[in-house]
Amino acid sequence: SNEYLKLENKKLRSLINESIESDKILAKVLIDKESPFLRSIVLNKGSKDKVKIGMAVVDQAYLVGKVIEVNYTNSRALLLSDLNSKIPVVLEPIGLQAVATGTGKEYGEIEYIKEKYENKIKIKDIVVYTSGLGGLFKPGLPVGKIARDKITKINFFSDFKQLEYVKIISYSFKGNNWCRH
């Protein structure tokens, strides 16, 4: 029965490993000579690794972008700094919903504030997180901090120029009626 337990243990361990791996896919950032204008990165994981369009890409805990193209061995992720990047966010600790957009530069911008919020920005440290709206990303992924000098400016937590390894996260929204952007 000891052998049986060992076998059970092994099975459980491989199941646990499988579930951990299927949740997060570690990818290496490849040098991308394709376009200096499009702020995107190429990753060494593709459909063979279960990468799908729309998945979140994180650097440690920080959101850096989302997968926009997938082939068998590689994928491309659009960075938060790209002009085409728009993600629903929440500003904490004030709880304001907004949209974070890329500027094509090193920082992001806050758009579509649900209410006038100039008067609320008395707090020094306002952190921008994904809100989870639209089911695109799971809520609570840290994006950046609101700049001291300009309340619509986001300083991203991650330095996109320094990315070497990232994790691709699959997040399935519980519910059928969500749309991908």
Task: Map each language-model feature to its residues.
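A secondary-structure micro-motif
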Residues: Y4, K11-H181
